[in-house]
Amino acid sequence: MAGLVATVTMVTLGALYYYGNDDLLEEESAPPQPERAEPAPAAPAAWSAANIRELVPVAPARVGSVSRPVPELPDYDRALSTLSAVVERYAGDPDNPWAIMHGVLARGPEFRLADGRGGLAHVFAAYAEPRAFGALTLLAFPRSREEKPVEPHADLVLKNLAEVGVDPAASFPVGAGVATAADLYRATLLKTWIRISENKLSFDGFNDMPWGLQALATWAPSDELRWVAEDGSSMDLDDFTDFTVAVLHKESKFMFQAMAAGQEFERKGQPLFSYACGGAHMVQGASFAVARGFGRPESRKAVAAQAGLLLYRLPIELRIYDDAMKKMRQHRQKLLVQRLKFLGHWLETMSKLEILGLFTPDDVQRATIEGAAQNLVITVKAIEDEGLFGDMAGVRSRDEQLYLDLVGDSAHAIRGLELALGRQSLAW
């Protein structure tokens, strides 16, 4: 439970925050209806701990990839080889479940630990914990254990399971028995709540919301999903979607205004830059939700507008990193890794927006995406030249966070680049 940041307390659940700058939101046709594997059974008015066992999450039937992949170049294979070596060795650390789930994101549900064991089975067996909802016991993952990150972002495990195509019915060892991915979904639903009137929510803050939103939307069994959360709050996935989009749009407003004025924005401690990966996960979570048919039409327009904003942000933020490296050479290595983080997440987010039907790049925009891919290659080579990839143990001994960034951002760079190249697809 955490108090909401005051900047968005005017957002009320069920009443979409007025976005403003409506001229920035592009008109578009009605969204296509998401496909589901099979018709879902009739749902009750609201799910609760009393009937949640009857909820059957449904994996999406639609699978897509970018319509015009970035043209192949040998440099991409070299960069991916370097990144893959990092992920296969260091994301496969049995003692780092957060890293393992990044390996799953990059390489799919068959990702294996460095010792050859299945990564997902190990994460469930070693780190899942019982989660009680009254007399009902399901499962969940802790934020950390023994100072090791497990789910520093709420619902990271479920989000990655849903995104990489794991069957909700898939079972995993937990304690002396087994549990299913569907059990994790049910628990996530029940523990998700927002009480605007009291300025409280179940997350650690706005930045903590998008993983759960994406997961709940991806496996939603019907076009409407309502539930009574463990605190008694009545929740609706449409409202949760609208609320998340409203937060995203408000925190992006200073960029929209600068873009409309033909100016560059400046980084002055705006909240968006404190969000995970510059707000990329907020965009991705909101994108999945609106593409799956949740939220109001205004929310879909607001998320689609993020594509233009990302194109605008690309050269400005790269220039910020490059200028900082010139001025603060002592921080060059950390800034290079931040550059990798930005580019990998940028390619991942842009590709997802396209696949989800929220953005269709024209020739100029496609060239910009190709430029981002080439910049990622340059960044990987620069990090390699600094000796970071070849001395991961040394990096870890000096700076644990830099080590974690190298592992996690290598995984996102693989996901982003391979989506842009058309080598990976997305189920939605």
Give the location of each predicted region:
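Preference for long, amphipathic alpha-helical scaffolds in soluble/luminal domains
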Residues: L13-W428
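Hydrophobic membrane-insertion alpha-helices, especially the h-region
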Residues: A2-A15
